[in-house]
Amino acid sequence: METFPHVFQYPFAVLQQQESGFPLRGRWHTDFFHNDHPIVLELGCGRGEYTVGLGKRFPEKNFIGIDIKGARMWAGAKESLQEGMSNVAFLRTDIELLDRFFAEGEVAEIWITFPDPQMKKVGKRLTGTRFLSLYDKVLERGGRIHLKTDSPFLYTYTKALVELNGLPVHEITDDLYGKGCVENEILGIRTYYEQQWLERGLTIKYISFGLGEPDCEYREPDIEIEPDSYRSYNRSRRSQAVPS
């Protein structure tokens, strides 16, 4: 992937060698995308099929898929390059370093698609307070966070956290495809991975919410949540997007 012009590989060891920091931080609009369209991130993008799917569906927005495992994103990077998609890029790095790659207010939306719910490690949950404070450093005021998950545990946890902290909720459903309460553009993008769980009878949960006031201290919900069977499913296959 070193030859792909829209793929940036900056794990922590590489970033440390850059005395001036990541060159596109605060300059994604002017120096890479060459437009002022909203920037949308997909965290833990895997093979990149959802990032590419969003890029096709929303040409008026810029999309950046982020994952630490570079081999995963090769498929999405190749497809977007072959199709000449100028609104898609990929970044190989740790999500914990997000503010080293994006300036304050540079990001309009964040997608978190089917992450590990981290049932035993609160600090690693991508919708937990630790990460919300990180997103605060890059997300514009009024920006949105989107979570799609098949994990009842993570959905319940995120819903409780949002309610406890009084965060604005834009859309929420515990059965995304069964109740049809969200915009069709979101329903129209399914990864193979997502389709697989639907065929097994799992429901997809979705919540779109905003952040709190600047510099607010987020609180963790003090509730007991029953663990789910997230680990019992084969999650190794994440291939092409499947149209609905």
From Swiss-Prot:
Concerning SUPFAM superfamilies, the annotation shows: S-adenosyl-L-methionine-dependent methyltransferases
Which residues are in coiled coils? Answer: none
Where does the signal peptide begin and end? Answer: none
Pathway entry? tRNA modification; N(7)-methylguanine-tRNA biosynthesis
NCBIfam families with a match to the protein in the record:
PRK00121.2-2
**What's this protein's function?**
Catalyzes the formation of N(7)-methylguanine at position 46 (m7G46) in tRNA.
Q: Which family does it belong to?
A: Belongs to the class I-like SAM-binding methyltransferase superfamily. TrmB family.
What this protein is called in its record is tRNA (guanine-N(7)-)-methyltransferase
Q: Which organism is it from?
A: Porphyromonas gingivalis (strain ATCC BAA-308 / W83)
- List the lineage, top down: Bacteria, Pseudomonadati, Bacteroidota, Bacteroidia, Bacteroidales
Q: Which gene encodes it?
A: trmB
